[in-house]
Amino acid sequence: MPLFVAKRTLPGITPAALMSAGVRAKTCCAEMTQEGESVRWVRSFFLPSTEQSHCYFDAASKLAVEEANQRARVPFDEVIEVIEMTPDMV
């Protein structure tokens, strides 16, 4: 399944708000999968110095990732398909 990143700018976000957004995203992904639209939140990284977040999703399409984030009320700047590379792959 393709891997996507949802890039976000989250000025002033608190740790509690980040956790709440994660709970909503996880719930919405599970609901969409149950409805037949496979989307799974893999992990997120928050960059405090730039107030940016990169959230990774396995999904059938970019639109599925956008819909999951919209349902979860988690804003995003853009969703981009990525190619994963790990040290074990090289």
Question: Where does each model-flagged region fall?
Answer:
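Amphipathic, hydrophobic secondary-structure cores in small proteins
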Residues: 42-57, 65
